[in-house]
Each structure stands twice: as structure tokens, then as C-alpha cells.
From Swiss-Prot:
GO biological process: DNA replication
Gene behind the chain: ssb2
Summary of subunit composition and partner proteins: Homotetramer.
Compositionally biased tracts (Gly residues): 123-156, 167-193
Protein's recorded name: Single-stranded DNA-binding protein 2
Classification via PROSITE patterns: SSB
Amino acid sequence: MAGETVITVVGNLVDDPELRFTPSGAAVAKFRVASTPRTFDRQTNEWKDGESLFLTCSVWRQAAENVAESLQRGMRVIVQGRLKQRSYEDREGVKRTVYELDVDEVGASLRSATAKVTKTSGQGRGGQGGYGGGGGGQGGGGWGGGPGGGQQGGGAPADDPWATGGAPAGGQQGGGGQGGGGWGGGSGGGGGYSDEPPF
């Protein structure tokens, strides 16, 4: 993943997300975001819209189904992902280049809206770390997580801050012998990072 361009785009959905399935059954949702910069003109005392950036985004698997169910045309969204360049020839034989976003995270902007978030069931994030982020079971790293101790992201359902029960704030537990490290360390259930998707 080194050298990839990760960007965050805030804008409005141009169309409803389009959900499709690959022949192997993996879900993919495509949608377009229009991001328009605004500047304040002091002479006219008005906000002026700049030139809009239209970006095609794709998101995969369970997140694709969540996007298709949750988002619709006109909603303001925040999208983070890896910018990709793709070249192709059109019908007239002219070589074209497009930029697309492989989405890692997407959500509704709450600047001028409200939302009630419902966690989907059966969605493990095994093997993914980060601060307080936890994998399923043993594994999931965190800052300073590792075989000797430190803090380890809790992956047990009791530590899930989205669960309906009263979970501890921050979702962190004192570390133990099992589990794997945060930034590239890692023994145990896949706490390190890999170029392979976690599915």
C-alpha cells in the first residue's frame, strides 16, 4: 500500500449508489460525488461556487451493501479512499484517462443533517488494528499492542462500543500475551498489515 494516494472528499451524491454483484458473489457499489469549493467574495458579500470535481467511487462487499441501503442522491457525504488512475480507449480509438476512488470509508456528513447509526450484525473486522480498533478474537493490534503487553484493542463483543450493553469508554483493555502488534508488528491473529484485503 506504500505510495498510494489516500484522499478525503466531501461532496454530494450525484446519483443513487448502484449495487451490483460479481460472478463470484461479491457486492460492489458505484456512486459519483460532486465536490464544489466555495469562496467568500468580499466585494459582493456573497459565497461563490467554484468548479465542481466529479469523482466516481467504488466500494466493495458488506460496505457496498450498507452504502446502497443507506445513501441516496443529493446526500452530503464524506468519502475516504485510494485515488486510482485508469486508462482506456474509447469507441473512436482515443486514449482516455480517468481518476476513480477505491473507497475505504464513507459516511453521511452531519454538518446540516442528523443520522441514527445502526450496526449491522455479523460484521467482524478481524485482523484490523489501529488505536482501540480491534480485530475479532485474538489479534487486532493497537498502539503499542504486542506480545509483551501494552494496550491492545479489544476484539471481544463485550468490548464493542456499538453493542447495546454498557461497554467501557475507549474500547481498550490492558494488553495480554495474545495478539499482535499495531504498526506492522505482529504475531497472532493477523494484527499486522498486509496488502491483501481482509476477506
